[in-house]
């Protein structure tokens, strides 16, 4: 046993040397910056656990919110109506079952794509294009006139008499703020005796007066004072928006009032919820919406700055690429060759204008108001640029308007005509959308030229039924973009020609047929 002791001590000493060597190696490894694998693994396990807990918590909140919305939308067919008056009309149900818009907290798609460096580079390319337009404008002015100055004549002309347009907006907004809510309050009273009938009749009269104010006042002011296009655009967009919001508020609340049995009254929704609805970026009324915890004012300022940048971009495009081409076109003899060349020339500016309108309004403007009001659901559009069919393009281009058309035109059409009349209901959606789009163009430009009506209703309707969701693949996406390019070129070319033809060939007196007859077909001074 004696000889084994030194051997054991020798092994212990060897073990201590190995341990010291290991510690020394660890120190050297730390000195040279090599990560400790065990500590790195533990750190990654902690990060994974934290991430899974956060994802599970957010998913649970999302499912709870979706379940709550589904319970609110579930038709109470087999349940008796409550004997007591409910606290709000948000818990009443529609007269017929159907899909309802569910609002959840989510970011806009472009905000998500901006987190990717490759997409930010595309955004930077558009900014570089604006810089090139500014530099080219300065260079041309310096060469031709010997001065360096950016003129914003087109922008100043377009927004002329803007204070008058804003003053006209005030009674339009006050009418929308007071009349629908007061009418609902009159209808929600207990139905007993002739007092309720008198109040209901008074509510109908108020709604008729409200419709007259919204429909007649902006048209009268625009025609009488000859407002320029951008000021008219403010009025017509607010006119259509307030009409759609008024209809949505009454459509979502009135059925619950008239479903109450026994002549008992019902509490209308709170006035604050209606006031919030008038400003939040949605056309579907709900008494509550998902809200974000705080307001990012730098995000609001950035979006408004981008709106201003898009306005400048559009003015430079029109001033540099459209005005020089179409200003004197009506002075020349008409030829098919000149018309085709003008349409092809206008495809580039037209698609640029489409992208600028989309980014400025559907992304920047709506996100700015959503952030100021802490409105959580930012899905104002979807990835329409990836569409392989025009049916998908129409659904994803403007989700805000599509939700309104789907809820109150398509679904109500199916309820009135039956589930088999899907084609008729879809045609009704196209007809309403085409007429409103043509009305907006007629209001803004000051003349009737049904280019948008024909493109939207005829060609758009045919493409919607022929290029449907069954077609997939990159070839169909290329075809969709080709039709978009051509459609924008046709619109820009024909509307610009008509605009300058009415300036070069004014009528001796204003008549109805003179307003609705295209002047560019006969104006060749």
From Swiss-Prot:
What post-translational events are described? Polyubiquitinated by AMFR/gp78 at Cys-280, leading to its degradation when the lipid levels are low. Association with AMFR/gp78 is mediated via interaction with INSIG1. High concentration of cholesterol and fatty acid results in Cys-280 oxidation, preventing ubiquitination at the same site, resulting in protein stabilization. Oxidized at Cys-280: high concentration of cholesterol and fatty acid induce reactive oxygen species, which oxidizes Cys-280, preventing ubiquitination at the same site, and resulting in protein stabilization.
Q: Which GO terms describe its cellular component?
A: brush border; endoplasmic reticulum membrane; membrane
The modified positions for Cysteine sulfenic acid (-SOH) read: 280
Phenotype upon knockout? Mice are more susceptible to high-fat diet-induced insulin resistance.
- Region Disordered, residue ranges: 1-34, 77-97
| Segments traversing the membrane | 120-141, 162-187, 200-223, 232-255, 297-329, 347-372, 421-445, 452-467, 474-505
The record lists cholesterol as bound by 118
Q: Where does an acyl-CoA bind?
A: 392, 395, 398, 402, 410, 433
Entry keyword Transferase:
yes
What are the positions of the active site?
437
Q: Per the UniProt record, which EC number(s) apply here?
A: 2.3.1.26
- Where are stretches of biased composition, namely Basic and acidic residues? 9-23
Write out the catalysed reaction: a sterol + a long-chain fatty acyl-CoA = a long-chain 3-hydroxysterol ester + CoA; cholesterol + an acyl-CoA = a cholesterol ester + CoA; cholesterol + (9Z)-octadecenoyl-CoA = cholesteryl (9Z-octadecenoate) + CoA; (5Z,8Z,11Z,14Z,17Z)-eicosapentaenoyl-CoA + cholesterol = (5Z,8Z,11Z,14Z,17Z-eicosapentaenoyl)-cholesterol + CoA
**Has UniProt tagged this entry with the keyword Lyase?**
no
Point out the cross-link Glycyl cysteine thioester (Cys-Gly) (interchain with G-Cter in ubiquitin) in this chain.
280
Membrane topology is: Multi-pass membrane protein
Residues in the Cytoplasmic compartment per record:
1-119, 188-199, 256-296, 373-420, 468-473
Arranged from A to Z, the UniProt key words for this protein are: Acyltransferase, Cholesterol metabolism, Endoplasmic reticulum, Lipid metabolism, Membrane, Oxidation, Steroid metabolism, Sterol metabolism, Thioester bond, Transferase, Transmembrane, Transmembrane helix, Ubl conjugation
What is the residue range of the motif FYXDWWN motif? 380-386
Q: How does it assemble?
A: May form homo- or heterodimers. Interacts with INSIG1; the interaction is direct and promotes association with AMFR/gp78.
Domain writeup:
Each protomer consists of 9 transmembrane segments, which enclose a cytosolic tunnel and a transmembrane tunnel that converge at the predicted catalytic site: acyl-CoA enters the active site through the cytosolic tunnel, whereas cholesterol enters from the side through the transmembrane tunnel.
Q: Which family does it belong to?
A: Belongs to the membrane-bound acyltransferase family. Sterol o-acyltransferase subfamily.
Quote the protein name from its UniProt record: Sterol O-acyltransferase 2
């Amino acid at each position: 046993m004696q000889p084994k002791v030194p051997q054991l001590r020798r092994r212990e000493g060897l073990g201590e040397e190995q341990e010291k060597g290991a510690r020394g190696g660890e120190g050297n490894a730390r000195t040279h910056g090599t990560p400790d694998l065990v500590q790195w693994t533990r750190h990654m396990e902690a990060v994974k656990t934290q991430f899974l807990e956060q994802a599970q918590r957010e998913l649970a909140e999302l499912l709870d919110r979706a379940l709550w919305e589904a319970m609110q939308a579930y038709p109470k067919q087999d349940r008796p109506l409550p004997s007591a008056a409910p606290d709000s009309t948000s818990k009443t149900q529609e007269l017929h079952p159907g899909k309802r818009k569910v609002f959840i907290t989510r970011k806009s798609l472009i905000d998500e794509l901006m987190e990717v460096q490759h997409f930010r580079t595309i955004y930077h390319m558009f900014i570089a294009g604006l810089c090139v337009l500014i530099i080219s404008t300065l260079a041309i002015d310096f060469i031709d006139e010997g001065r360096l100055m950016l003129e914003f004549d087109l922008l100043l002309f377009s927004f002329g008499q803007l204070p008058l347009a804003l003053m006209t907006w005030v009674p339009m907004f006050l009418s929308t703020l007071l009349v629908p809510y007061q009418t609902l309050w009159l209808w929600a009273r207990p139905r007993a005796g002739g007092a309720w009938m008198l109040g209901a009749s008074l509510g109908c009269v108020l709604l008729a007066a409200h419709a007259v104010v919204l429909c007649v006042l902006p048209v009268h002011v625009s025609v009488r004072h000859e407002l320029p296009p951008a000021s008219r655009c403010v009025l017509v967009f607010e006119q259509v928006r307030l009409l759609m919001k008024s209809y949505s508020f009454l459509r979502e609340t009135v059925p619950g009032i008239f479903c109450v049995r026994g002549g008992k009254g019902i509490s209308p929704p709170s006035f604050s919820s209606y006031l919030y609805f008038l400003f939040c970026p949605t056309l579907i009324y709900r008494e509550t919406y998902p809200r974000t915890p705080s307001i990012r004012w730098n995000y609001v300022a950035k979006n408004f700055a981008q709106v201003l940048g898009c306005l400048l971009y559009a003015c430079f495009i029109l001033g540099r690429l459209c005005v020089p081409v179409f200003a004197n076109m009506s002075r020349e003899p008409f030829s098919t060759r000149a018309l085709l060349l003008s349409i092809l020339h206008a495809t580039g500016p037209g698609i640029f204008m489409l992208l600028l309108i989309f980014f400025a309004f559907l992304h920047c403007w709506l996100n700015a108001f959503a952030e100021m009001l802490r409105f959580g659901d930012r899905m104002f559009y979807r990835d329409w640029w990836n569409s392989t069919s025009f049916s998908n393009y129409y659904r994803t281009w403007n989700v805000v308007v599509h939700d309104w058309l789907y809820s109150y035109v398509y679904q109500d059409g199916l309820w009135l005509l039956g589930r088999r009349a899907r084609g008729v209901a879809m045609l009704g959606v196209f007809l309403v959308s085409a007429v409103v789009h043509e009305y907006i163009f007629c209001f803004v430009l000051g003349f009737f030229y049904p280019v948008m009506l024909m493109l939207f209703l005829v060609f758009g309707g045919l493409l919607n039924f022929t290029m449907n969701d069954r077609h997939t693949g990159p070839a169909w996406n290329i075809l969709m973009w080709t039709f978009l390019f051509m459609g924008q070129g046709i619109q820009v070319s024909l509307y610009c020609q008509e605009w300058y033809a009415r300036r070069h060939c004014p009528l001796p007196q204003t008549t109805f047929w003179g307003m609705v007859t295209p002047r560019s077909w006969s104006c060749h001074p």
